[in-house]
Regions:
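Extracytoplasmic copper-binding redox domains, predominantly the cupredoxin/blue-copper superfamily
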Residues: 17-221
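Bacterial N-terminal signal peptides
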Residues: 3-13
């Protein structure tokens, strides 16, 4: 939830316009099985023995992120990411080009975030409650990992006109809040790819409900 200061900044940025919500969902192109039964058995054995943290159930959409892009001068809305349940939540993250994104450690154990191919980023351990700030230049996407726990993976997208982020539930639903009225591009990111896009216009005074988006193979951003 935005604080009073951030909300005021949004209103100033859009000339006193109200802030609205967008509701939608994704469908199709479910995640493929990530590992064999034998590797799963090995993973759960290590969890039981305390060698690995227990990873949350990813379902079909833990690697999916909904974002809005467009003309917007305020800070990105709802773009909060972190480690939770032994992995990145969500595993696909986005940040505005030329800024930094914070990855909070919400687990009770230490993580060591790595970003493959990102110049100037040094993996360092982050204890419970700590956060790492990642500088995000133009380019990417970049692969994310954890030098302590090899099962952790993810991707970081750099987006020049990022406005807002929304996580996608296991049932495929997402919701943006506190979005100023106006035209935007609604984009669905999954791993290193953009798998759906649609132009939307947020009206003043009511929630915009978007028809389901079909996730497809990679599309250029």
């Amino acid at each position: 939830m935005l604080g009073a200061g951030c909300a005021a900044a949004l209103l100033v940025a859009f000339g006193g316009a109200s802030a609205e919500s967008i509701e939608g969902s994704v469908q199709g192109n479910k995640s493929e099985q990530a590992s064999s039964d034998s590797s799963k058995q090995d993973y759960y054995w290590k969890v039981w023995n305390g060698a690995l943290p227990e990873q949350r159930d990813k379902g079909d959409h833990a690697d999916v992120l909904a974002v809005l892009t467009g003309k917007f001068t305020g800070p990105p809305i709802g773009c909060k990411f972190g480690f939770r349940g032994g992995g990145l939540a969500p595993s696909t993250i986005a940040a505005r080009s030329g800024t930094t994104v914070r990855i909070e450690n919400r687990d009770a154990f230490t993580h060591e975030l790595s970003v493959s191919g990102l110049p100037g980023f040094t993996p360092l351990e982050s204890g419970p409650g700590k956060a790492r700030a990642i500088p995000v230049p133009a380019g990417g996407p970049w692969e994310l990992g954890d030098r302590i726990y090899g099962h952790v993976d993810g991707h970081l997208h750099s987006m020049r006109e990022l406005v807002a982020c929304a996580t996608v539930t296991a049932s495929g639903k997402f919701r943006f809040d506190n979005v100023p009225p106006g035209p935007y591009s609604l984009r669905i990111l999954r791993g290193p790819e953009q798998v759906a896009t649609r132009r939307v216009t947020v009206p003043a005074g009511k929630t915009l409900k978007v028809d389901p988006l079909n996730m497809s193979k990679s599309r250029r951003r």
